Amino acid sequence: MEDLSHDLMGQWCNAIKDCVKVYSDKRTRLWSFEVKVKINRSNVREAFFQTVSNSSSANFGYLVAKEINSDAVKELRILSSSHGIGVILLDAENPLESQIIIPARERNNIDWNTANRLAEENMDFKQYIDHIRVFYQSYKINKSDWI
């Protein structure tokens, strides 16, 4: 298991504590997607760094947008090479046709402090963490939990 301070872990919500205890063998990879309608030159850095911040609780982080202006793509490539965030061009009409423009680089460690903050602020994320814990305890996937 990752080296975690007992004092710090004592401040986490129970969902995070329970997940960390069973996550040590990493049979899964956690993914984070920050979805925007449009990325252009004026909002590219803000959207990107929001993705960086919100994806530290995942092994892979992606910035997803329905529209990405060509002048923003160069900046995204530069930022992605430094921070490992991937970029997906979303086809809203046919999501299976969406394109990975820049693949994300895998992070080996999860920022559990950020995961704890997200779990305390967002019940959907807390439920997601609970599903991961259940998977690790039972090695079974209940498909209805993930839809």
Where are the model-predicted features located?
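Short acidic alpha-helical/loop segments enriched in Asp/Glu that coordinate divalent cations
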Residues: 11-13, 47
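Conserved catalytic cores of phosphodiester-cleaving nucleases, focusing on short active-site segments
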Residues: 1-11, 28-40
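Short, charged beta->alpha transition segments
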Residues: 16-22, 50
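Histidine-anchored nucleotide/phosphate-binding helix
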Residues: 46-54
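Nucleic-acid nuclease catalytic cores
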Residues: 39-44, 57-95
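Non-catalytic C-terminal interaction segments of nucleic acid-processing enzymes
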Residues: 20-23, 77-147
